[in-house]
Amino acid sequence: MSFEPTDSAAAKAGNPSNPQRLPTALQADLAAAFPQLERGETRDGTTWLRVAMPQLIDLATWVKARGFVRFLDCTVVDEPSRADRFELNYLLYSMAEHCWLRLKARSLGEAPSMTSLFAAADWYEREVFDLFGVCFVGHPNLRRILLPDDFEGPAPLRRDVPIGSEPVDFTVTRELYGT
């Protein structure tokens, strides 16, 4: 049996499974500062903001200055039928407000790096680069993180890459793993 606090005091105490909604004052400030934003909420109440790629860093800087200092994830949705096929998703968290915020921006395959704002973005952006081929401009160390350095071919998690298998030569030895 699990205990799920439901009152706001318990939620503000730090239970990430019971986040608060984006504060009304912050919503109004966002609308004034970024009138072109598209805004919505997920089923669990997480607010998402979609912005044009050129305004992404400005928006991220703005929300970071207002307490969204925890960078938790960078993911991508690949929709090959769209001209701007990649939708980058950045998940941020405010410990002061106890709420999540997802930033979204569409891309053709290139985006500004968030590493100058959030050091934690480093490896997430490298993973997206490696598996989807999205290039993060200004990233200090944009190199492969999961695939072999000599990997050739299309980025493997793109939806237009055919599903199948290719034999990969590797050997597991007792010396390697000490078993």
For the regions a protein language model found, what residue spans apply to each?
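Terminal low-complexity/charged segments
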Residues: 1-179
